[in-house]
Amino acid sequence: MIGLSKPKKYTVGLANLAKFGYLTLQDQAASANVGRAGEYLALSRLSLAGYFCTLAPSQDHDGYIQTDARILTLQVKTSSKIRHWKYQFYTKHGEGRQRSDVYAFVALDLEAIFFCRGDDPIIRPTSTHLSADLFNQDTMHKVLSSFD
């Protein structure tokens, strides 16, 4: 079943709703577009900062970043707007899968990105909630230099 006859109030992440077939095709496309926009915004900021990066054709990672020391994996999580005073991101990953080296949390309405390491405790097992003030910090260089 692709869609429901009655609209439902979304109380869980869009990824979960899509997985169980509760999103219409239009909602799934909109969710995919939000995610793609976040990926391109994150990679453009990295490129402008002088890092060589590319999108990844992988289900485990969204991109790769080349630093002087090594190639890092990137996971981009995108939220289109603030909800309940926080930005909410679906951060559950599959059993046995390795987390990416770097996470980029994108707030599309602010056009701002919060970067953190994949082993940072701020990333919760299922859903990560970030306040808007975290997006005012310049975290990209700090996080990427921590791998050198």
In which residue ranges do the predicted regions lie?
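Mixed-charge (Asp/Glu-Lys/Arg
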Residues: 1-59, 66-148
